[in-house]
Amino acid sequence: MPVVHTCTYCGRSIEPGTGLMYVKNDGSVLWFCSSKCFKLWRMGRDPRKLKWTERYTQLRR
């Protein structure tokens, strides 16, 4: 049974067979729905400041 994950950065659901799994040196696993989310996370951008993320909408409610 395929597992549907949520994007660590934007909060959207990731369909099976898509996305990017990033494993940190401490063993924690981060899931990203697109290279856009992965690159923004690597640059240190705050997802709460981007209007298209789920974290932004949760903060503004």
Curated annotation (Swiss-Prot):
Its cofactor is Zn(2+). This is Large ribosomal subunit protein eL24. It comes from the Archaea. It comes from Hyperthermus butylicus (strain DSM 5456 / JCM 9403 / PLM1-5). Belongs to the eukaryotic ribosomal protein eL24 family. GO terms for biological process: translation. GO terms for molecular function: rRNA binding; structural constituent of ribosome; zinc ion binding. GO terms for cellular component: ribonucleoprotein complex; ribosome. Zn(2+) binds at residues 7, 10, 33, 37. NCBIfam families: PRK14891.1-1. Binds 1 zinc ion per subunit. Binds to the 23S rRNA. PROSITE patterns: RIBOSOMAL_L24E. A zinc finger (C4-type) spans 7-37. Keywords: Metal-binding, Ribonucleoprotein, Ribosomal protein, RNA-binding, rRNA-binding, Zinc, Zinc-finger. Part of the 50S ribosomal subunit. Forms a cluster with proteins L3 and L14. PANTHER family: 60S RIBOSOMAL PROTEIN L24 (PTHR10792), RIBOSOMAL PROTEIN L24 (PTHR10792:SF1).
